Amino acid sequence: MSIAYPFTAIVGQDDMKRALTIAAVDPGIGGVLVLGERGTGKSTTIRALAALLPKIDVVSGCSYQCDPLAPRPGLCAQCGKPADTPDSKAMTIPVVDLPLGSTEDRVVGALDIERALVNGEKAFQPGLLAQANRGFLYVDEVNLLEDHIVDALLDVAASGENVVEREGLSVRHPAQFVLVGSGNPEEGELRPQLQDRFGLSVDVRTPGDVPTRVEIIRLREAFDHDRTAFRKKWARKESALRRKIQVARDQLDDVDTPAVLLETAAKLCLALGTDGLRGELTLVRSARALAALEGKSAATLKHLRAMAPSVLRHRLRRDPLDESSADIRVERVIAELFQESVNDGGN
């Protein structure tokens, strides 16, 4: 098993690290889209997140990591049968890679050919979506995915379950995961339907100052020289951040959401002309998750403002009369609205 680079040793890229951490605190936010040029640490940072994720209880022997305490209707066919409380075990939240060249059978699952040939029985071979249930599904170069794979992801993302009907099989199982995608926008555009499914979006850039670049090189060389020793050196910081994420997850439901926060989120999305209400809902949830991560009892306008660019930049319609970037448009409206909030006595 390869040794991953420590998350806390990554220099800069604060927006990306914050977005991934927020998604770990509240998986319901809807995933993270990371776009940027090659060599900016996108894949390294995303894979480093796996070591920070807490453990969850799963039904022993279940191929879908079903929650032993969840209501029966939300479980797989085997775990959903009436019975006593099933045996359970603890496991780290899974992070599953979806390779670019994966077939649809590998992604959604298919007939278990070996069992069919050896035993003459029709059995389902779970795919990557099953492995990612209650965890993270990572797609590198997500903007280059084939259309039929994108369609499968969209169907599952909308329903939270995977339905496979083929080769005489009819299988339905839970498939709720945090979708994390990375890619270089210069190599191809992401389909709007899939882009809208990401709760947060981050643009990463190559560091433009010499000290930062030197520090990145120094740390990377130290890691490549002795990976075990390097991880041991950063173990304390990794452990501290892991505990911080776990505490935030535990306290998330207790974080208050003031009325002014809801009103400001609605005004912001209305002013930017975002479609539907997904923007407001995600903005409020991410502000609350950030407050929980900071150990606060209530989300404030400061948290809302901090998360607004990541939540809204990929939801804007293209305006032929405004050539400004999405970030500039979001920041412009934020500045106007938050000045109003200050004048009205908001915090």
Positions of predicted regions on the chain:
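Alpha-helix N-cap/helix-initiation sites
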Residues: 13, 210, 258-259, 275-281, ...
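A general alpha-helix detector
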Residues: 6, 197, 244-248, 264-268, ...
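Conserved ASCE/P-loop NTPase catalytic core
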Residues: 1-208
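C-terminal engagement/docking regions of AAA+ P-loop ATPases
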Residues: 266-278, 289-347
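Conserved AAA+ ATPase core "coupling" helix
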Residues: 104-109, 190-249
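Conserved AAA+ ATPase small/helical "lid" subdomain
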Residues: 228-283
